[in-house]
């Protein structure tokens, strides 16, 4: 086995190792009575067979492991050197089980370290993209620091100006959280007035955020477009509408009418149709109920059947009498309901003989009293005359009862009837 030092091997120009430099691993010199190894960088791509083992001249003097690499990029050299020297050393025997366990743990630790190191240097595409963004950002920062605008910005707070890289909502959240964090050290309570001042002073561009009106059943689209200043969209919508549609649009709300007035072309068409409708409404007698609506083709059959015609006198009298009867029946019904709420157990309701309004009827006394304030007639239910207590009816005409009342229970007649049965 030829003895050659690491300096005798051919090295590429990119090798970071320094020739002839010999240091100990981890900056400390440890001496061993076994052997000494002179190591070269494995990343230089020579054959591994050129690694030589140098026996010490004096066996009593401890040798040192001296890898030649000094750069931090040659950590692989040091790890491989330690592993090879540990395997080749005579201390680690094949028959020694304890040493084999130590060797297995070293192998597993080296494999995990190699995997972690390889993951660090992997390029998935995102790292190169972020690296280019960082380089661009560094160049922009250098140019910005040299510019005169960089002197003005330190006086201004960064929270007042919107961050263009963030969404408006995220920028708003960041500003609010930063203000709460600053003031939370002084006062644990939330100062709402201070938050309102911060929100009013900052330009957060929250007015154009999409999705604020999601979930609502009713939404005024034209009002939202006018509030956000989309005049071109409103003009495009109004050009698609006809004259009568514009007339109906102006009746919806004041906001829609203002939108119509702001558009010149649509407002001219609206004014022309309004003049035409007013002229036609003067000629028609039915303009009071129909309004400005002109006859449409879709409802012509319905409009023909519902056209207005002057009613005859007889028909008008009958309709007025029927309406009066409906009103009277409705009012009488309400009166009966109100009086029925005040009835006792032995009382019932009857219509008054004079005014047909509700009257309280007592079955045992055969008396009825009208509850109308203007009437209050008290009469006998047999002869329908003024009530006469226990006296016989004056006219002698007793009205036949609608239903015959049987004998009272416990009387002789009722007992005889029971005996017959």
From Swiss-Prot:
Disruption phenotype: Death at the preimplantation stage. Embryos display normal cell proliferation but mitotic progression is severely defective during embryonic cleavage with multipolar spindles and misaligned chromosomes frequently observed. The modification Phosphoserine is found at residue 85. Expressed in oocytes and granulosa cells. Expressed in proliferating cells compartments in hair follicle and skin epidermis, spermatogonia, and intestinal crypts. Pathway: Protein modification; protein ubiquitination. Disulfide bonds: none annotated. Its main location: nucleus. GO terms for molecular function: anaphase-promoting complex binding; protein kinase binding; ubiquitin ligase inhibitor activity; zinc ion binding. Residues 296-299 are annotated as: Competitively blocks access of APC substrates to the D-box coreceptor formed by FZR1 and ANAPC10. Residues 411-421 are annotated as: Sufficient to suppress UBE2S activity. A zinc finger (ZBR-type) spans 348-396. It is found in: Nucleus; Cytoplasm; Cytoplasm, Cytoskeleton, Spindle. The keyword Acetylation does not apply. Residues 236-383 are annotated as: Requires for efficient binding to CDC20. Residues 236-313 are annotated as: Sufficient for interaction with RPS6KA2. Residues 223-273 form the F-box domain. Pfam families: F-box, IBR_1. The keyword Signal does not apply. GO terms for cellular component: cytoplasm; meiotic spindle; nucleoplasm; nucleus; spindle. Gene3D superfamilies: 1.20.1280.50, 2.20.25.20. Residues 114-219 are annotated as: Interaction with EVI5. It comes from the Eukaryota. Phosphorylation by CDK2 and subsequently by PLK1 triggers degradation during early mitosis through ubiquitin-mediated proteolysis by the SCF ubiquitin ligase complex containing the F-box protein BTRC. This degradation is necessary for the activation of APC in late mitosis and subsequent mitotic progression. Phosphorylated by RPS6KA2; increases and stabilizes interaction with CDC20. Ubiquitinated by the SCF(BTRC) complex following phosphorylation by PLK1. Undergoes both 'Lys-11' and 'Lys-48'-linked polyubiquitination by APC-FZR1 complex leading to degradation during G1 phase by the proteasome. Degraded through the SCF(BTRC) complex; degradation occurs during oocyte maturation, between germinal vesicle breakdown (GVBD) and meiosis I, and is required for the meiosis I-meiosis II transition. Residues 280-421 are annotated as: Inhibits APC ubiquitin ligase activity. Part of a SCF (SKP1-cullin-F-box) protein ligase complex. Interacts with BTRC; mediates proteolysis by the SCF ubiquitin ligase complex leading to activation of APC in late mitosis and subsequent mitotic progression. Interacts with FZR1/CDH1 and the N-terminal substrate-binding domain of CDC20; prevents APC activation. Also interacts with EVI5 which blocks its phosphorylation by PLK1 and prevents its subsequent binding to BTRC and degradation. Regulator of APC activity during mitotic and meiotic cell cycle. During mitotic cell cycle plays a role as both substrate and inhibitor of APC-FZR1 complex. During G1 phase, plays a role as substrate of APC-FZR1 complex E3 ligase. Then switches as an inhibitor of APC-FZR1 complex during S and G2 leading to cell-cycle commitment. This is F-box only protein 5. The lineage of its organism: Eukaryota, Metazoa, Chordata, Craniata, Vertebrata. The gene is Fbxo5.
């Amino acid at each position: 086995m030829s003895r050659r030092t690491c300096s005798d091997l051919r090295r590429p120009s990119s090798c970071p190792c320094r020739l002839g430099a010999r240091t100990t691993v981890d900056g400390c010199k440890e001496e061993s009575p076994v052997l000494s190894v002179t190591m070269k960088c494995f990343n230089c791509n020579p054959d591994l067979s050129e690694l030589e083992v140098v026996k010490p001249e004096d066996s009593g003097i401890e040798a040192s492991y001296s890898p030649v690499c000094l750069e931090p990029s040659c950590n692989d050299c040091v790890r491989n050197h330690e592993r090879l020297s540990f395997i080749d050393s005579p201390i680690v025997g094949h028959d020694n089980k304890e040493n084999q366990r130590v060797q297995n743990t070293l192998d597993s630790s080296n494999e995990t370290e190699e995997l972690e190191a390889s993951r660090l240097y992997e390029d998935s595409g995102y790292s190169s993209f972020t690296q280019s963004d960082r380089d661009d950002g560094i160049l922009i920062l250098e140019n910005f620091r040299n510019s005169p605008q960089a002197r003005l910005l330190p006086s201004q707070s960064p929270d007042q100006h919107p961050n263009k890289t963030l969404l408006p909502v995220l920028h708003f959240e960041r500003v609010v959280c930063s203000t709460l964090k600053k003031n939370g050290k002084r006062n644990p309570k939330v100062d709402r007035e201070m938050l309102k001042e911060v929100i009013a002073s900052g330009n957060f561009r929250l007015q154009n955020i999409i999705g604020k009106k999601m979930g609502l059943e009713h939404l005024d689209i034209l009002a939202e477009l006018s509030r956000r200043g989309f005049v071109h969209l409103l003009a495009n919508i109004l050009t698609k509408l006809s004259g009568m549609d514009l007339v109906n649009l102006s009746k919806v709300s004041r906001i829609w009418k203002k939108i119509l007035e702001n558009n010149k072309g649509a407002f001219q068409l609206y004014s022309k149709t309004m003049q035409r409708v007013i002229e036609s409404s003067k000629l028609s007698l039915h303009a009071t109920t129909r309004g400005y609506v002109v006859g449409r083709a879709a409802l012509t059959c319905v409009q023909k059947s519902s056209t207005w015609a002057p009613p005859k006198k007889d028909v008008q009298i009958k309709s007025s009498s029927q309406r009066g009867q409906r009103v009277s029946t409705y009012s009488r019904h309400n009166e009966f309901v109100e009086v029925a709420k005040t009835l006792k157990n032995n009382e019932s309701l009857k219509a008054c003989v004079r005014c047909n309004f509700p009257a309280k009827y007592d079955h045992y006394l055969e008396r009825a009293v009208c509850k109308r304030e203007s009437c209050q007639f008290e009469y006998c239910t047999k002869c329908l005359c003024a009530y006469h207590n226990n006296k016989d009816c004056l006219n002698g005409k007793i009205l036949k009862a609608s239903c015959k009342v049987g004998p009272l229970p416990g009387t002789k007649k009722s007992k005889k009837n029971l005996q017959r049965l």
